[in-house]
């Protein structure tokens, strides 16, 4: 399957059309951003690591019965995916307090959240992805009540699968975001799962093994991503 026209260029990925109107090529670039794109740097191997990491995770979720857009790994930095009608709202699950939750509520970083929190955010960089709720989604027509309920169900199911996967690898799944779309009327998991859109801490040291290393200028971003991949058994080379 060959990529054709560039359809969309995001902060770290580019989407291309193919000869099949139902399929797209997703290219992972080496770009890394923070502050809604205000700060951007490039890191060698990042596109490759995230592409193979994402394919690995999507395969695990598909094995658990979660419908995903993933079709095939095409190259080190490209994968073939179903074309989805994306929902403009992203889902976030929080197993521990971190990031914006700590700032918003003034709570201690790292405390366990039981049951996990479920948040919704409107995908809009200019407005810094404002938090919304089910009522907003219904009133503004972003997603139907039924499809939103399905998104929440799949997000919590993914959390159950991934918490165990990372725990077995000596990592804490602190939080993560998922994006969904519709494929022939069905709610399907899209976009990506990688250390770019999740928080992962070492169980013993609580070292941050995700994009917070870039956000907080801790250094060692790619080394952390590759370490996580190796612990999970992701084949990078």
Swiss-Prot record:
Alphabetical list of InterPro entries matching this protein: SAICAR_synt/ADE2_N, SAICAR_synt_PurC, SAICAR_synth, SAICAR_synthetase, SAICAR_synthetase_CS
Domain of life: Bacteria
Signal peptide: none
Pathway: Purine metabolism; IMP biosynthesis via de novo pathway; 5-amino-1-(5-phospho-D-ribosyl)imidazole-4-carboxamide from 5-amino-1-(5-phospho-D-ribosyl)imidazole-4-carboxylate: step 1/2
Pfam family for this entry, one: SAICAR_synt
Catalysed reactions, semicolon-separated: 5-amino-1-(5-phospho-D-ribosyl)imidazole-4-carboxylate + L-aspartate + ATP = (2S)-2-[5-amino-1-(5-phospho-beta-D-ribosyl)imidazole-4-carboxamido]succinate + ADP + phosphate + 2 H(+)
One cellular component (GO) term of this entry: cytosol
Keyword Nucleotide-binding found: yes
Keywords: ATP-binding, Ligase, Nucleotide-binding, Purine biosynthesis
EC number in record: 6.3.2.6
Any GO MF annotation of the entry: ATP binding
Biological processes, Gene Ontology terms: 'de novo' IMP biosynthetic process; cobalamin biosynthetic process
HAMAP family in the cross-refs: SAICAR_synth
PANTHER family: MULTIFUNCTIONAL PROTEIN ADE2 (PTHR43599), SI:DKEY-6E2.2 (PTHR43599:SF3)
Family affiliation: Belongs to the SAICAR synthetase family.
NCBIfam families membership: purC
Protein name (record): Phosphoribosylaminoimidazole-succinocarboxamide synthase
Gene source species: Enterobacter sp. (strain 638)
């Amino acid at each position: 399957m060959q990529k054709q026209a560039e359809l969309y260029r995001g902060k770290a990925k580019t989407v291309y059309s193919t000869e099949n109107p139902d399929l797209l090529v997703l290219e992972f670039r080496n770009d890394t951003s923070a502050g809604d794109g205000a700060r951007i740097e490039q890191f060698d191997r990042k596109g490759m690591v995230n592409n193979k990491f994402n394919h690995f995770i999507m395969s695990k979720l598909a094995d658990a019965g979660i419908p995903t857009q993933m079709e095939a790994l095409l190259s080190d930095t490209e994968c073939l995916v179903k074309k989805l009608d994306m929902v403009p709202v992203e889902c976030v699950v929080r197993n521990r307090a971190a990031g914006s939750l700590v700032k918003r509520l003034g709570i201690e970083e790292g405390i366990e959240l039981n049951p996990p929190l479920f948040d919704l955010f409107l995908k809009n960089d200019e407005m810094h992805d404002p938090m919304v709720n089910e009522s907003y989604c219904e009133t503004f027509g972003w997603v139907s009540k039924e499809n939103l309920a399905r998104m929440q169900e799949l997000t919590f199911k993914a959390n159950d699968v991934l918490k165990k996967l990372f725990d077995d690898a000596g990592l804490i799944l602190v939080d993560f975001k998922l994006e969904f779309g519709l494929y022939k009327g069905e709610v399907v998991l899209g976009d990506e799962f990688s250390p770019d859109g999740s928080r992962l801490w070492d169980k013993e040291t609580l070292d941050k093994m995700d994009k917070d290393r870039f956000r907080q200028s801790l250094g060692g971003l790619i080394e952390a991503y590759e370490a996580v991949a190796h612990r999970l058994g992701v084949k990078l080379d």
